[in-house]
Structures are given as C-alpha cells and as structure tokens.
Amino acid sequence: VQMESVFWVVSKIAWALIAPETLLLFLLILSAGLLWTRYNKQGRVLISSTVFIITLVSVLPFSSWILRPLEDRFPIPKELPNRVDGIIVLAGAENISVTAARGQPSFHDGAERLTTFVWLAHIYPDAVLLFSGGSGSLTDQKHRPADTARKIFNQSGLDPERVRFELNSKNTAENASKSYELIQPSPDQHWVLVTSAFHMPRSVGLFRKAGWNVIPYPVDFQTTKSFSLKFDLREIGRFSQGIREWLGLIVYRATGDTLTFFPGPKE
C-alpha cells in the first residue's frame, strides 16, 4: 500500500512538471528572460517558436488526432443485457473545491459520467450501484468526489443510500483493485463500467487485470467524426489530456498493471 502511495505522489508531481501546458509556460518564461540578456537573439527565436507551437495546437485538430483513437476504441453498446448485476461509475468529473465552497454540485468536463450512471440506475432498479473514487488531490484529502456525487444523485431522483461508495482510491488502478475488493463479483455477473470515452481503454485494461470483465459504456466524448480549423486555446488542455492518457497506457503496461498496451473489445 505504501508503494502505491509513493507511485501516486511521484506520478502526480511528474505529470505536473512535464504536462504540455507546463512546458509551454516554461518556454515562454525562459525566452522572456533571455530577451534581457546577451542571448536576446536566441530569446527571440525561442519565444517566436513557442508562440508558433501554441497557435498550431490551438488551431489544428491535434487534440482530436490524439483523443479520437482512444474514444473510438470501445463503441457505445447498442444494447445491454436484460440482466445487469451492477453499474460502476468512476469519479473524476467532480469539481470538489467549488462544490465545497458553494454548496452546489459543480463539475469539470465529464458530468455525463454521473448523468448516465443515474439513467442506467433507473433502467436497472435491481442493479448494485458503485461510485468509485477518493480524492486525487495532493493538497486536499478532506473533500471527496463522493460529496458532489451525493448532491447530484439527490437532485436527480436517485437515493444515495442505494449507492455503494468506494472512497479510498486515488487513481484508476486503485479504482479497479479497491472496487474489486469491495464488491467481490462472480465471473458470471454482468457489470457495466461508465467513464469518459478517452479514459475507457486504460480503465478496462486495469479492471480486466483485477479480474473484472466489465461491459464498457463510454460517455463524455470530446471528438467528432470531422475536423474543423478554429483558434481555441482550450485545445491545449484537450491535447494535454490525450498525451496524459497515452502516457498512462504506456506506464501501466510497463508496470504490469494491464495485460496489453491498448486494451480493446474482446472478440
């Protein structure tokens, strides 16, 4: 357990340092500093190159090129089994700090995770419901995603008492292992996994390694079948999101937490 915590802390710090938006900010600061030294020529070249990269990523559909293979890996099920034993939703969409400050449920991207979970819960009234996810913050372990989830369940007509909460996982690998320990599902059961489409390959790979052959139900799609050219600085964040997901697939395969690099539908 201690090694899991160390891995989590190291991965959080490492990503904060190498994330594309961090590197771009570092290049801007470095180039601005060089402008005031005898290396001002190099500074002009560097700042021009950095602005060019920012413009390129903000205009061209780099984020779609990176995210779309992830989102297309698992199709939305055309139909689900008549009997669904349980439904799992992974935390990650909740804006826990704003929820705590304002008293209303607040979300980052990905609120579809919870709205789809509630919808499926109404369709399958006998299914076991599981919300999986503790605080993924290095600085705030007091407020948890479940606080936001309970509020939205209440507002959506789903009794929070019907939902089981796994509150201690800090990343997707722990979502899988701790949820499995909590539920102890049998191999013949049908469990539906709800998470963002770009996050589904990594999630399914980790759940399979834990011994849980879930039915993927991807939501929160970020891409379309076509590409458009427009200037949008938010594209940098989506590009970063895609890079993070591919790095996660590489790292989890390298550490043996998944059985294949790019988990996909089973034949």
Predicted features along the sequence, with ranges:
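Extracytoplasmic/luminal low-complexity segments enriched in Pro/Gly and acidic/polar residues
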Residues: 221-222, 226, 230, 235-267
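Membrane-interface helix-boundary motifs at transmembrane edges
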Residues: 35-44
